[in-house]
Regions:
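Glycine-rich NAD(P)-binding loop of Rossmann-like domains
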Residues: 1-15, 180
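Conserved acidic E/D residue at the C-terminus of a beta-strand in Rossmann-like folds
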Residues: 29-31
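Rossmann-like adenosine-cofactor binding region
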Residues: 34-130
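Short, structured coil segments at secondary-structure junctions
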Residues: 23, 43-44, 133-135
Length: 208
């Protein structure tokens, strides 16, 4: 079977691995925090402390990490060159995790066989975005979170956060990103300090 790896194995990444288990695949993951041994055994997962060690053996790499300074342009020319030749990237996280021009060059050279994703940078994508004319790509306009079940989950989460705020009680860690000016809860688990907001200025360079 194919070797499939996820960059990050939080709620979304782990759910992706669970969905792929029935398809006779070899599943891999890279994350700053290792999953519990019972989960690894349940899904027969191979953990990689180093991202590049996973990339060189995977036929498909799915990106499920947030955008922060450590992941901005994580997949650039150098990183993609370390991937298994002819591999595929699936990016449903954030567009700027992948260097758009590096991806296009890798498709053209054959280093990547294809690229699929639900996210662009900038977004919405301008008419001259290189991915619009790139061969072997499957792109959608950031619609993966618009299912009825996802919308219901968002609404329930917002309500719970507001109720905690007005009641003066602690917000659950899974909803917490920053507290007292510091990363906290899920934010401390998944993000790094710094700013990726320069992307907003970069986006103004594109034609509409």
């Amino acid at each position: 079977g194919m070797h499939i790896g996820t960059v990050a194995a939080g709620r979304i990444g782990l759910d992706a691995l669970r969905k792929m288990k029935p398809f006779d695949t070899h599943l891999h993951y890279f994350d700053r925090h290792r999953l519990h041994e019972s989960v690894e055994k349940e899904l027969n997962l191979t953990y990689h402390e180093d991202l590049d060690s996973m990339l060189k053996i995977c036929d498909v790499v799915t990106i499920n990490c947030p955008l922060h300074p450590e992941t901005e342009h994580l997949f650039n020319d150098e990183r993609i060159s370390k991937m298994k030749k002819g591999a595929y990237i699936v990016n449903t996280a954030r567009g700027k995790i992948c260097d758009k021009d590096a991806v296009a060059r890798a498709i053209q050279s054959g280093q990547l066989s294809g690229y699929a994703g639900d996210v662009w940078f900038p977004q919405p994508a301008p008419n001259d975005h290189v991915w619009r004319d790139m061969p072997n790509n499957g792109m959608t306009p950031h619609t993966s979170g618009t299912s009825l079940s996802a919308q219901a989950r968002y609404a329930a989460g917002v309500r719970e956060i507001l109720e905690c705020f007005f009641d003066g009680t602690n917000i659950r860690d899974q909803y917490l990103i920053v507290k007292d000016g510091n990363l906290a809860g899920m934010g401390a688990h998944s993000y790094s300090k710094g700013s990726s907001t320069e992307g907003s200025e970069e986006a103004t360079k594109y034609k509409k």
